[in-house]
């Protein structure tokens, strides 16, 4: 979505995105960041796969920040978000600053999407609605990332955000 790399697989199919990809992304300020797209969060994995996924997810611990991409059209959006938060806490990444990208916004009418965004903002979450298919919300997400990094650097007193 952010790297605009058309070779990346995006399918609504179980285990379609098992590989981790890293891409450089230029933000509106000119700053370049490295984004890592990891495996998604899957509930009720067979026990044999849990260890393999955990190893991949534990790499998240070294991240300066997280962009959590959620399917805005999913009927169980808040349950999925809860699973993500629980998993992040379990692997020691619960305190890493994060932004939410509510993808597939093109599949929702404006009112339900606004309700979701308002609910998340009211709970203190930084969120932006996006559509990878239409490209909508991507400039706003990049602006939010830029502002977020500036705020994080100012708060930490550092020029670079590192873990």
Predicted regions and their residues:
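Extended hydrophobic-aromatic, low-complexity segments
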Residues: 11-12, 27, 32-36, 43-47, ...
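Conserved C-terminal guanine-recognition region of P-loop GTPase G domains, centered on the G4
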Residues: 30-31, 53-126
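Active-site glycine-centered loops adjacent to acidic/histidine catalytic or metal-binding residues
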Residues: 37, 103, 131
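Short, contiguous acidic/charged loop-to-helix segments that flank catalytic cores in large enzymes
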Residues: 44-47, 71-76, 129-133
